[in-house]
């Protein structure tokens, strides 16, 4: 299928749903900067393979935004695609909300997959479109209906990171996070950023190239935790670590139904710049949202003595490799 044929198929799906605009960002369900093959929907639809970009498809036009690293590449790859290149930061180039506002009608419908856009991103766009009285349609992945040979989600097993490398147990990390939750009077903490979960749970994986994480979600309560992950990817050490720390394992996609069960009188700590729109939309509207960065962000930035020593060892190995690659024969 050519890019033009893909766009035509997408527009047919949009027409069935009375959508004026459909947005395809470069993201996965966890707001990860670099995404795995399954999540390269923008690349599939546009033909542009750079690591950063956003595609907006309207009834009779389409545009792609990217930054200065990719202007030359994007101009070349978008030839004959009918997609206009929007060079971010250049004078006269509209922002994404401005472009949507121009091409969406009054009382129109704005579509996207709610799992690949973070909550704050959606709010910021809708704030700029409030005069148009827009309806959001975020329940379906339209690209997935077109992408017949889409790569599957990764299934390779991860591994438990021993304390001789992490320097701190999962038990102690969860206790520290619960202390911060108490300060905020939070009953629940939703964590969706993969690096944070990897640090908290002392686990690593191979789900994204050059980024040792596993696709999963984590919900921490006052007494127990819930992790949402492909169970086949867990080894015995990881299962034992979860059991020791009262971590209940659920299927990866069950997060969306699980958050519906959080009671209305709960107080949920989460970061709207990271947690995807579909998750927050499934929360009871009476829940008090505490919007702030994950406590683990600052915690993992403060390296303990074991981590510092391991960093030194890693730097020595890197230095030797660099010298070997640059020395003269």
Feature-to-residue mapping (PLM):
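Terminal domain-start leader segments
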Residues: 1-329
